[in-house]
């Protein structure tokens, strides 16, 4: 059987997928595309001559690919995913599935129509702590989850913000706090298998936020959302918060006890069974030496293996398939709507064709378009 031909769209984040996939039997990483000349030169210094470094999407997508990894701008994944699937190419999306409700529907309908594989390759659920929460919860020993929490705090210096968002219309300057939820709500969803059905959210926007000198247009410190899940439980989750200190934290409170990651060490777990004392331990699923050579402490290596297992057919369904991935995007978008008007929003069942019809044609976006304008405020009282 011929190797699966893989292309990567976006050199900066995309190179995190190169090493592991290039070494995996049955796969040929044959193309990497980036529009920026400096990034293409940096990529060429790392990859072999057998990898074609392209300057345009059209050049890369014409190379007979079996699958493409989208590592381009956060708010542009859906459009390119649809173009790829329409050409018979499977899609791995590195970040949120879609930035608007209309594109959420367009993406799902395209995937259903074409029958292509789709995976949201969020790396946080593969990390040691979240992986142990999923293992313990799905074993059933703690019973049903009643309440859960997730925090993703990632402050940046002004120099880092300028490096990550170098242009006036860069998506990072405008992103609402609820949108970047793969590292928070995404972990709770994969650990429990549950889906959000309702959301109410508030943003953190104090006087100190308003007065902060920053290149970021959205000066909010982040957002907090409450989600009613499909089993009736309530999850509290941040999106991306710029507060200190940097870190991730997750907790599941269940009928039979609580399991959470340690705040000082997200690879360590605290387990409290009902009626018993605290058990603190390092899970068995620690990163290997080889995994630690890759990004995010080893999580990038793990998500690469999951990508290969899914594309090769070893795994039939990824942790975040098209429906779960799009639901995660909708949760963030409806969270912004809640911030803007103070209401609680129902999140449609994306599998239900009648329920999801409400999404059709709603392309309002907080991210600037080609004209430099956005069609949905990125926060309350921002015009």
Q: Where are the regions a protein language model picked out?
A:
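Predominantly a Rossmann-like dinucleotide-binding segment in NAD(P)-dependent oxidoreductases
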Residues: 12, 117, 124-217, 342
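Beta-loop-alpha module in the N-terminal Rossmann-like domain of NAD(P)-dependent dehydrogenases
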Residues: 17, 49-110
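N-terminal Rossmann-like dinucleotide-binding module
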Residues: 1-48
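Short, Asp-centered acidic motifs that coordinate Mg2+ and/or phosphate
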Residues: 31, 67, 147
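Residues that mark the start of a beta-strand
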Residues: 3-5, 144-147, 234
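Glycine- and charged-residue-rich phosphate/anionic-cofactor binding loop of Rossmann-like
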Residues: 28-29, 310-326
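Hydrophobic residues in well-ordered beta-strands that form the structural core
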Residues: 93, 118-120, 149, 261
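Contiguous beta-strand/loop segments that form the cofactor/metal-binding neighborhood of enzyme cores
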Residues: 179-268, 293, 299-318, 332-336, ...
């Amino acid at each position: 059987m011929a190797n699966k031909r893989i292309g990567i769209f976006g050199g900066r984040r995309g190179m995190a997928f190169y090493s592991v996939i290039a070494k995996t039997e049955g796969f040929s990483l044959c193309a990497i595309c980036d529009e920026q000349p400096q990034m293409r030169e940096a990529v060429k210094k790392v990859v072999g001559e057998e990898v074609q470094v392209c300057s345009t999407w059209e050049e890369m997508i014409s190379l007979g690919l079996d699958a493409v990894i989208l590592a381009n701008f956060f708010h542009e994944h859906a459009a390119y995913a649809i173009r790829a699937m329409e050409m018979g190419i499977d899609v791995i999306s590195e970040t949120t599935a879609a930035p608007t409700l209309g594109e959420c529907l367009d993406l799902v309908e395209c995937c259903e129509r074409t029958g292509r594989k789709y995976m949201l390759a969020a790396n946080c659920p593969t990390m040691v702590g979240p992986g142990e929460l999923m293992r313990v919860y799905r074993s059933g020993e703690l019973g049903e989850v009643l309440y859960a929490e997730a925090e993703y705090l990632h402050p940046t210096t002004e120099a880092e913000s300028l490096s990550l968002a170098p242009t006036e219309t860069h998506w990072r300057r405008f992103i609402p706090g609820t949108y970047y939820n793969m590292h928070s709500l995404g972990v709770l969803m994969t650990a429990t298998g549950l889906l959000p059905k309702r959301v109410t959210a508030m943003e953190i926007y104090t006087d100190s936020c308003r007065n902060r000198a920053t290149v970021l247009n959205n000066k909010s410190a982040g957002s907090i959302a409450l989600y009613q899940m499909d089993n009736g439980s309530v999850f509290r989750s941040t999106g991306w918060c710029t507060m200190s200190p940097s870190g991730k934290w997750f907790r599941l409170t269940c009928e039979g006890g609580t399991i959470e990651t340690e705040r000082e060490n997200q690879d360590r777990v605290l387990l409290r069974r009902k009626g018993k004392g605290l058990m603190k331990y390092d899970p068995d699923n620690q990163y290997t030496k080889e995994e630690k050579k890759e990004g995010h402490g080893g999580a990038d290596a793990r998500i690469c293996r999951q990508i290969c297992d899914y594309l090769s057919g070893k795994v039939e369904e990824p942790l975040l398939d098209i429906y779960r991935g799009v639901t995660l995007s909708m949760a963030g978008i409806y969270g912004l709507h809640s911030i803007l008007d103070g209401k609680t929003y129902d999140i449609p069942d994306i599998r239900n064709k009648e329920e999801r019809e409400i999404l059709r044609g709603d392309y309002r976006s907080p991210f600037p378009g080609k004209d430099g304008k956005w069609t949905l405020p990125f926060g309350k009282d921002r015009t």
